[in-house]
Amino acid sequence: MPIYDLIIKNGIICTASDIYAAEIAVNNGKVQLIAASIDPSLGSEVIDAEGAFITPGGIDAHVHVDEPLKLLGDVVDTMEHATRSAVAGGTTTVVAFSTQDVSKKGPSALAESVKLDVDEYSEQTLYCDYGLHLILFQIEKPSVEARELLDVQLQAAYNDYGVSSVKMFMTYPGLQISDYDIMSAMYATRKNGFTTMLHAENGDMVKWMIEALEEQGLTDAYYHGVSRPSIVEGEATNRAITLATTMDTPILFVHVSSPQAAEVIKQAQTKGLKVYAETCPQYALLSDAITRCHHHGEVESYGVGIDLSSISESPFTNPDDRFIGSKYICSPPIRPEGTQKSIWKGMNNGTFTIVGSDHCSYNYYEKTSTASKHRAFDPENNKNGEFRYIPNGLPGVCTRMPLLYDYGYLRGNLTSMMKLVEIQCTNPAKVYGMYPQKGSILPGVSDADLVIWYPDDSKKEYNSKPKLITNKLMEHNCDYTPFEGIEIKNWPRYTIVKGKIVYKEGEILKENADGKYLKRGKSFMCTPKNEWVTEWRPKYES
């Protein structure tokens, strides 16, 4: 008689710290038992892993959904689309963003901003659990009183909705926040144990560079990257570390792309500072050749470890179409060839604590009443495809796990499969207050969020196993993927969320979708050192 909801047999469990052959029993959405052998008759459902890896479900803590006109366009994925795409690629938890609603005032203002999003997403079919970060871009009272009010607002957001992380921007008109306000925010995030996230680019440098390029008529998509050179990211990173050191506040840099920024981060970590960082697959795998070739009409290499000759649907099919490069515009930008090795190095040596996707999906063939191809083309408003009008962002929540499995683990750019689990599953859970419920495989404690991959060494042919990345495979609402046509050697065979199979051999099982809003705890890693550079102390430390 069955006593377990699900049994997984003949698998190789891989966690952040160990790899071993074992079998797993699941009950009531939790990992119930791990043993060398489990009687299959005890399970209502049984999966034979056939010697493949079983990993914790991936955690993508950098996902943008439902964001209208934030950065020049509409993000086309709802939370439903994003979670569907996530599970198709082995991610079982996403953390998206709730942008501060500046019309809300008073102690509950931030909690009310979160409530708007939670209420909206509760009406959608969700394929996995999700959490929310807060995007903070305006301090209600730009004065000493601001930090005290923000303290109360953060407490309310945590108590009501389990939000324990705040993101701020050092660039983008309308979102860029001053150093003064960053310090005020750090005052409050430190007190409340929030993870402080920063998009580090010097916004004033970017603004100046954009205007200087436009003055010379250099406005193709390629020049987006030229306007945001590595030094722009490096300067802002160094400045943010200085602010954080002054405030004794742990910080996490999101989507780091620059070797210069990575070096500054590693130096701070070597000094014992509480500095963490996230990078993304696009910075390890793509190079700016993908935009440069359209600008110069040349076909060059795609990036590190990716052979264009094997790509069936080459992004370089029409090198004369300079606007195709807009498919690869993100901020920070994809960097020149040769820099990607430093990103892999950072994943292996601890510079990068986590890997997120920065999923931010904009349609390439978006049309408006006055635009022939894209919102960036709007002659009535003097828009002719200039890079300043192209939305910044790439879809990527589905490809994050498989790309690092193949181009990281299988091809030797990551030191081990355990490293993949550490930076894609376990560390995100620890950094963002979800461990050990998420990001681990611990009996009686962890949610049964699991990924069963295809066997790597099997000679058996699996018709459901993809060989190339295609947009159809993504299960998102976007009309392209930047990795179209790229060879892929493995892919999730089964994605299991809280004990239910939601993705099986290429098929989404909508009837098993049961994602919920996830209230998070405080970070396991982002705790202050209680070391100060001056005699000043926050009042709450007095």
From Swiss-Prot:
Record's cofactor remark: Binds 2 Zn(2+) ions per subunit.
Gene Ontology molecular function terms on file: dihydropyrimidinase activity; metal ion binding
Keyword Hydrolase found: yes
UniProt xrefs under SUPFAM superfamilies: Composite domain of metallo-dependent hydrolases, Metallo-dependent hydrolases
Binding annotation for Zn(2+) 2: K167, H199, H255
Cofactor: Zn(2+)
Binding positions (Zn(2+) 1): H62, H64, K167, D358
Residues involved in substrate binding: Y172, S331, N392
EC class name: hydrolase
Source superkingdom: Eukaryota
Induction of the gene: Up-regulated by dihydrouracil and N-carbamyl-beta-alanine. Detectable only in cells grown on dihydrouracil and N-carbamyl-beta-alanine as sole nitrogen source.
Record's catalysed reaction(s): 5,6-dihydrouracil + H2O = 3-(carbamoylamino)propanoate + H(+)
Keyword Metal-binding: yes
PTM annotation: Carboxylation allows a single lysine to coordinate two zinc ions.
The enzyme's E.C. designation: 3.5.2.2
Keyword entries, A-Z: Hydrolase, Metal-binding, Zinc
Any one GO CC term of the record: cytoplasm
Listed InterPro entries: Amidohydro-rel, Hydantoinase/dihydroPyrase, Metal-dep_hydrolase_composite, Metal_Hydrolase, Metallo-dep_Hydrolases_sf
Positions where N6-carboxylysine occurs in the chain: K167
Subunit structure: Homotetramer.
Stated family: Belongs to the metallo-dependent hydrolases superfamily. Hydantoinase/dihydropyrimidinase family.
Function: Catalyzes the second step of the reductive pyrimidine degradation, the reversible hydrolytic ring opening of dihydropyrimidines. Can catalyze the ring opening of 5,6-dihydrouracil to N-carbamyl-alanine and of 5,6-dihydrothymine to N-carbamyl-amino isobutyrate.
Protein name from the UniProt record: Dihydropyrimidinase
Species assigned in the record: Lachancea kluyveri (strain ATCC 58438 / CBS 3082 / BCRC 21498 / NBRC 1685 / JCM 7257 / NCYC 543 / NRRL Y-12651) (Yeast)
Taxonomic lineage: Eukaryota, Fungi, Dikarya, Ascomycota, Saccharomycotina
Gene assigned in the entry: PYD2
